[in-house]
């Protein structure tokens, strides 16, 4: 009797266990969120790479915070490389010089110049000479042409506005052809290198971005016992930010307007923003437009830098 009772209890427990509802299924794990797309900026490599990396790191930190998207700086090796990167869409926005900006826009339909510094609507190039060359300061392009004839000379980058295009234009306006120089004109690759080459006497004279010259003077990085300014050009439009047309699709129709607002509120008097403005050598950014660079395009075509 006891054995039968035990068997019955076992049977009941088995039936109850078999009939119990299965445990609820676990909800599938949520898929990880896709990483936010980075907004990629670049710039012509017109100065020492270390200076550029420091400056653009400060800028991307500021932009990432203000825009709410990751902003990344992509350095390039030369002027042609950044024009190509903009053309193929490897970068979204680039800090171009006047000439490279025109070259880039002509290759990307719908690209827009949106911002420049306050100093870029009245920019200049500075001609410098080694004191050992005997070239003295002068007052106009005609005197410049006469003084440079028979001397060695270096530009900056081949595609630089302030380091090649406009200096060559004003040299020609004064009556000097490149064949009037001693040997072929050099191309240093950057404004900083132009200073060092002329300072060392490798070339008798050279031309560069006036803002870079002033900045290096201020920091005591120029030996004025060896090099001096001989002439400064009339003004022209130069550096500017250009944005690709597909940014509106990738980041929103109002993203360009957000960029303009973010840049134009930068203030050199703000301690947190001073590093950025000091790097750019300006007090503020202002809006610009493609039409402001029509003269640069015309001169580029005359000199053969734009086909």
Q: PLM features: what roles do these ranges have?
A:
Residues 117-174:
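A conserved helix-loop-strand patch within extracytoplasmic ligand-binding domains
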Residues 73-84, 97-99, 178-196:
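Short helix-initiation/N-cap motifs at beta->coil->alpha
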Residues 95-108, 172-173, 199, 204-225:
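A ligand-binding cleft/hinge motif common to bilobed small-molecule-binding domains
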Residues 16-18:
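C-terminal motif of bacterial Sec signal peptides marking the signal peptidase cleavage site
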Residues 111-120, 181-184, 217-235:
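Short beta-strand->loop
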Residues 86-87, 148, 198-199:
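Hydrophobic residues within well-ordered alpha-helices
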Residues 20-21, 33-43, 47-58, 236, ...:
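An extracytoplasmic/periplasmic, membrane-proximal ligand-sensing/linker region
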Residues 57-68, 157, 161-187, 217-223, ...:
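Ligand-binding cleft/hinge of the Venus flytrap
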């Amino acid at each position: 009797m006891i054995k039968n009772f035990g068997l019955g209890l076992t049977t009941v427990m088995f039936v109850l266990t078999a009939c119990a509802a299965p445990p609820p299924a676990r909800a599938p794990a949520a898929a990880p969120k896709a990483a936010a797309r980075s907004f990629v900026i670049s710039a012509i490599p017109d100065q020492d790479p270390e200076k550029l990396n420091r400056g653009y790191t400060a800028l991307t930190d500021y932009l990432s915070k203000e825009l709410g998207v990751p902003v990344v700086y992509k350095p390039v090796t030369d002027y042609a490389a950044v024009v190509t990167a903009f053309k193929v869409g490897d970068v979204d926005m680039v800090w171009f010089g006047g000439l490279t900006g025109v070259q880039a826009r002509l290759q990307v339909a719908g690209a827009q110049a949106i911002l420049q510094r306050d100093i870029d609507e009245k920019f200049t190039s500075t001609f410098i000479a080694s004191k050992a060359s005997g070239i003295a300061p002068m007052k106009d392009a005609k005197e410049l042409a006469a003084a440079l004839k028979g001397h060695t000379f270096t530009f900056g980058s081949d595609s630089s506005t302030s380091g090649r295009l406009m200096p060559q234009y004003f040299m020609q306006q004064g009556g000097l052809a490149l064949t009037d120089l001693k040997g072929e004109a050099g191309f240093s690759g950057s404004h900083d290198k132009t200073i060092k080459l002329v300072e060392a006497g490798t070339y008798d004279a050279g031309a560069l971005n006036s803002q870079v010259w002033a900045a290096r003077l201020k920091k005591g990085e120029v030996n004025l016992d060896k090099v001096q300014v001989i002439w400064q050009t009339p003004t022209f439009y130069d550096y500017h930010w250009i944005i690709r047309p597909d940014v509106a699709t990738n980041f929103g129709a109002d993203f360009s307007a957000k960029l303009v607002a973010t840049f134009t509120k930068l203030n050199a008097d703000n301690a947190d923003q001073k590093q950025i403005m000091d790097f750019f050598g300006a007090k503020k950014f202002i809006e610009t437009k493609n039409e402001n660079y029509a003269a640069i395009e015309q001169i580029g075509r005359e000199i053969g830098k734009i086909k």
